[in-house]
Amino acid sequence: MSYLFTSESVSEGHPDKVSDQISDAILDQFLATDPDSKVACETLVTTGQVVLAGEVKSRSYVDVQETARRVIEKIGYTKSEYGFDARSCGIFSSIHGQSADINRGVDRSDRSEQGAGDQGMMFGYATNETENYMPLTVDLAHHLLYELATIRKEPSSPMPYLRPDAKSQVTIEHDDEGRPVRIDTIVISTQHDEFVQASDGISEAEADRMMQERIHHDIATILIPRVKMLYKPEIAALFDEKVRLFVNPTGKFVIGGPHGDTGLTGRKIIVDTYGGRASHGGGAFSGKDPSKVDRSAAYAARHIAKNMVAAGVADEMLVQVAYAIGVAEPVSIYVNTKGRSHVALSDGQIAEKIKKIFDMRPYAIEQRLKLRNPIYEETAAYGHFGREPYEAYKTFVDEHGTEQMRIVELFTWEKLDYVNKIKAEFGLS
């Protein structure tokens, strides 16, 4: 029997994502000049104000206020009428040193035996229903908002009224084998200028209706066609005439961003991962250096699941890894192929083979995925997974105020670089 499944996403201008991006930009600044930095940075944003807090152990000096302002400006909060803008917002920092009790459990004279930064369980997931091995619901939700932000930033934007804050939600019908067969519902809520105002002959309700009609029309005729072009024909065909499209269902969305809602780092953990299709251990990612296995082990688990599915071991795979604080080796690795395995092994036997192929000690993960580089700001909006790996030039400022250019490799955990090893281990052609 068919079923409906729903995932959501939020834009880079959503207050929680503003916080995530600031936290990760500060992390990157520390890692750029001291790769061994230990960082846990939390951010709160609200009307006209940013609050930074957390713990750091580093040889670097970072101008956290200027870093935060740069991120806010890049997102698009540049006008005082937004109630939150890069140049005028107040920034308060309460970042202090890392606990020595935590640090003693992580640092080792033999770096390969570096302990996990905390206890916990982390999950990785992959499915072959899309080319990037992500659930289509969350992948589409991300693409809708990424493309909407692209439209907003275009010099001659066809939607010039757009503001940075936005949310999306996608409901897809799946057949009884879990394959997407039809897009049922798309919801887009986007912040906008008050480009039609009440005046003589136009009531406030009529002005609101006119704005909503214009935005709905533009979403349907500008945004949706552009997003369809991003997908191969069989996915684009799921956009049929029966799709229900809700645009700004409340009727008006002028007050938004941190002025409309307070934002906090780490509050969009399902958006950041698999849109609810897979389990989540509860730990957020942004603002954390890779000694925190909440982040590094979740990336490693995704890397495993994606390569295993790409190698043909299963059509779908969930990987759980768990740690004890201060201990290098994981306490457990669990696999669930949801009955969609293509090898004559139990899920437990598959997990044993994973242990042979992948070293899941924290330091080994850091080295394999190059996680001690300043690569995190780009992850903090539109999902940490399903992204294309690429090299980027990034500029950082050292403690002397000198700009440094770095070439870094982003989204290394999305590489399909273990497929051949997996095929050899499992006897797959």
Swiss-Prot record:
Pathway listed: Amino-acid biosynthesis; S-adenosyl-L-methionine biosynthesis; S-adenosyl-L-methionine from L-methionine: step 1/1
Positions of the UniProt region annotated as Flexible loop: 98-108
Chain sites annotated for binding Mg(2+): 16
Cellular component aspect of the GO annotation: cytoplasm
Species the sequence originates in: Porphyromonas gingivalis (strain ATCC 33277 / DSM 20709 / CIP 103683 / JCM 12257 / NCTC 11834 / 2561)
Name of the featured protein: S-adenosylmethionine synthase
Underlying gene: metK
Chain sites annotated for binding K(+): 42
Quaternary structure note: Homotetramer; dimer of dimers.
Location(s) in or outside the cell: Cytoplasm
